[in-house]
Amino acid sequence: YRVGGSPQKETDDYSVWTNDLLNKIIASKTIIQPGKATIGHQLINSDVVYVVVNGRGTMEVIEYMNSKEGHGSDPSRGIDHKDSYALTAGDVILVESGDYVKVVNESDHDQLAYLRIFDREGWRK
């Protein structure tokens, strides 16, 4: 199966392609433009494996004391632990269900691309 075709989500900052043909897992590809970032979101009902394919950037991960559904750029409720990881091609990162994730492309010239692999139960269309 290939993650390609038309983007499922597209903004000026980033694009997301998703392959939902498999029965138990979802594979998606995200490309972030130079100097841009994802909006950030909280993972619901699924751990997610991120595989950095190209570029460099940072990943902000916040663990909550009380998880709630949500998207947004200011996850200020009930923060238990906050980490920031430098990303480069070849990195593999596991983010657990309930955590908030935001990815920033730190390059002025190159795109940042990564794959996400997660359980179908955690997919928000």
For each of these PLM feature ranges, what is it?
Residues 39-41, 59-61, 83-85, 95, ...:
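Short beta-strand His + acidic residue motifs that chelate non-heme Fe in jelly-roll/DSBH
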Residues 11-13, 26-45, 62-66, 97:
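Conserved short histidine dyad/triad with adjacent acidic residue
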